[in-house]
A protein has these predicted regions:
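Pyridoxal 5′-phosphate
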Residues: 2-301
Length: 301
């Protein structure tokens, strides 16, 4: 980015939407790490704490019902935002890291065996590399890397040479957090499916910059964080195809993710709640919903 582009951006009409920028002369250039928050997101969180603060999904009194409505309405908004088939395909997590670990632990450890291969790109953030290293060590699977050219491109020839009948999971970023360049994610997903593999997409860097349609993309799993989308820290999303999520065991155990519990056994809640153990980050979810409204309001163009 050239300096005159930065200066032009600093005078943008949208700058006034962000208190930290509006009240200072800061020119913020670290949005790949975390975005600033617009006033609309701050106001939504403030309103939740002032008027609806209670533990969602845990009570039938007015405040808890309102908090539950806010929480589930946000889930519906996220599902619509990425064009998921239904809100049950949206799992709230702490961040993209937890979303990817959920897939690795709950799907990977239960579906990968010795001799299988897991393919990841050399461009991966640690969040989409270390979980698959763990799965490979635990199962005896082989971790295979899709290497890139000097300019960062992952070629179709490289993809074709590394994804084969032994490949069971392909995990790849949509946009590199280091280079900022897109991967040929559509072709990678198509190739993964052609050999019967599951495709896991790290969308943390892509979703702030382009409209995501998980149906058109045909990703089996798609992970992202709220804090890079003008939302608060501490809230992430995992999208997963319903048939895959239904077959996966819970990642964590605790309150609200069970239907019945006795001394010796328990039955788990239906999707999406079987993956959301413990007290949820309700204010983070509300802030994420407000961030989606803000981003859709200004548009991706």
């Amino acid at each position: 980015m050239f300096i005159w582009e930065v200066v032009k951006m600093s005078k943008s009409v949208y700058r006034a939407d962000f208190p930290l920028l509006d009240l200072s002369d800061v020119i913020y250039m670290d949005s790949a790490a975390t975005s600033q928050r617009p006033q609309a997101v701050i106001d939504a969180i403030d309103e939740f704490y002032k008027r609806h603060n209670a533990n969602p999904l845990r009570g039938v009194y007015k405040l808890s019902v309102e908090a539950t409505q806010d929480y589930e309405n946000a889930r519906t908004k996220v599902a619509k935002f990425i064009n998921a088939s239904g809100s049950e395909e949206i799992i709230f997590t702490r961040n993209a890291t937890e979303s990817l670990n959920l897939v690795a632990y709950s799907y990977g450890l239960n579906n990968i065996k010795a001799g299988d291969e897991i393919a990841v790109s050399i461009l991966e953030h640690h969040s989409n590399l270390l979980p698959w290293q763990m799965v490979a060590r635990a199962t005896g699977a082989k971790l295979v890397f899709l290497d890139c050219e000097e300019d960062g491109e992952i070629t179709k020839a490289e993809i074709d040479s590394k994804i084969n009948g032994k490949t069971k999971i392909v995990a790849c970023t949509q946009i590199s957090n280091v280079l900022g360049i897109p991967t040929p994610i559509e072709y990678i997903i198509e190739k993964a499916h052609s050999v019967g593999a599951v495709a896991v997409v790290d969308g943390a860097q892509s979703i702030p910059h382009k409209k995501i349609d998980v149906k058109a993309l045909d990703a089996d799993f798609f992970a992202f964080s709220g804090h890079k989308l003008c939302g608060p820290m501490g809230i992430g999303v995992l999208y997963g195809k319903k048939e895959l999520l239904d077959a996966m065991p819970p990642f964590l155990s605790g309150g609200e993710m069970i239907e019945y519990v006795s001394r010796d056994t328990a039955t788990y809640a239906e999707l999406p709640h079987k993956f959301e153990a413990g007290t949820v980050n309700a204010e983070g979810v509300v802030g994420l919903a407000a961030a989606i409204d803000y981003v859709e309001g200004i548009g991706y163009d």
